[in-house]
A protein has these predicted regions:
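Catalytic Walker B motif of ABC-type/P-loop ATPase nucleotide-binding domains
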Residues: 47-51
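ABC ATPase nucleotide-binding domains
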Residues: 115-136
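Conserved ABC ATPase signature
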Residues: 22-26, 30
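Helical segment within the ABC ATPase nucleotide-binding domain
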Residues: 61-75
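ABC ATPase "signature
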Residues: 107-108
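Conserved ABC ATPase "signature" region
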Residues: 2-18
Length: 136
């Protein structure tokens, strides 16, 4: 990506203040935000991210997820993100795929995919996810 695209991505991610800083001076969370900005700067039609919210506090987790949702909704970017935080996934993405042993065992709207039974079967924990999921 060229400098203008990187600058625009830093602004979009909300980390203009980090421009020009040495990566060794950044916290893990700041480094993660820079990586997200660099991915966004590519302006690719498909964005593949592995744990884009790792090392981030709640405010920045939400900001990154809102950015990804905005990229999908307004820029037409397809976002494929690996997330282990089921609450974030079900709140921000209208379609989820649940993998078990590397295979897709469920695919669809969060409310249909992340049932208590499926979470128990796949993740081995008995929890009920509450709140209205994205996309029903």
């Amino acid at each position: 990506a060229d400098r203008a695209a990187v600058d625009a991505a830093l602004t979009r991610v909300g980390i203009d203040r980090l421009r020009g800083r040495d990566a060794r001076e950044l916290s893990l969370g700041e480094r993660q935000l820079v990586l997200v900005a660099l991915a966004v700067a590519q302006a690719a039609p498909l964005l593949v991210l592995d744990e884009p919210t790792v090392h981030l506090d709640l405010r920045h987790q939400v900001a990154v997820m809102e950015l990804l949702a905005d990229l999908n909704e307004h820029d037409g970017t397809t976002v494929l993100a690996v997330l282990h935080d089921l609450s974030l996934a079900r709140h921000f993405f209208p379609r989820l795929a649940v993998l078990d042993g590397g295979r897709i065992v469920a695919d669809g709207p969060p409310g249909r995919v992340l049932t208590r039974e499926r979470v128990r079967a796949v993740f081995g924990v008995d929890v009920a996810l509450t709140g209205a999921p994205s996309g029903g």
